[in-house]
């Protein structure tokens, strides 16, 4: 199987998102890379399922709370930008203050 560099990046992000999801399910607080990966992965999956950019911008703020992450992580993440594939093409989704 031949993957483009972009496909490899998406696969690595998805794998990191799965790991973060498992750790969250165990009750562990997520660190910075895990929080970014989980939110990004959820946005990419929502886009693939046919949700809109506006829906994903809103949903991106509901994935994690301060209680889900280590101290200081919410302040480190001012915004997240994810290039996601929607049914009508690839679009950039920006989520401001994703952890409230």
Curated annotation (Swiss-Prot):
Pfam family, one: Urease_gamma
EC number: 3.5.1.5
Metabolic or biological pathway: Nitrogen metabolism; urea degradation; CO(2) and NH(3) from urea (urease route): step 1/1
Alphabetical GO biological process terms: urea catabolic process
GO cellular component: cytoplasm
Compartments where located: Cytoplasm
UniProt xrefs under InterPro entries: Urease_gamma, Urease_gamma/gamma-beta_su, Urease_gamma_sf, Urease_subunit
Keywords attached to this entry: Cytoplasm, Hydrolase
Reaction catalyzed: urea + 2 H2O + H(+) = hydrogencarbonate + 2 NH4(+)
UniProt GO molecular function: nickel cation binding; urease activity
Membership in a protein family: Belongs to the urease gamma subunit family.
NCBIfam families with a match to the protein in the record: PRK13241.1, urease_gam
Record note on quaternary structure: Heterotrimer of UreA (gamma), UreB (beta) and UreC (alpha) subunits. Three heterotrimers associate to form the active enzyme.
Name of this chain's protein: Urease subunit gamma 1
């Amino acid at each position: 199987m031949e993957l483009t560099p972009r496909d490899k990046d998406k696969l690595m992000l998805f794998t990191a998102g799965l790991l973060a999801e498992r750790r969250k399910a165990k009750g562990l607080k997520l660190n910075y890379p895990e929080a970014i990966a989980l939110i990004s992965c959820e946005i990419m999956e929502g886009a693939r399922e046919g949700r809109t950019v506006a829906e994903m911008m809103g949903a991106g703020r509901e994935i994690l709370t301060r209680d889900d992450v280590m101290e200081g992580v919410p302040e480190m993440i001012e915004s997240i930008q994810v290039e996601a594939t929607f049914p009508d093409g690839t679009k950039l989704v920006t989520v401001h203050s994703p952890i409230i």
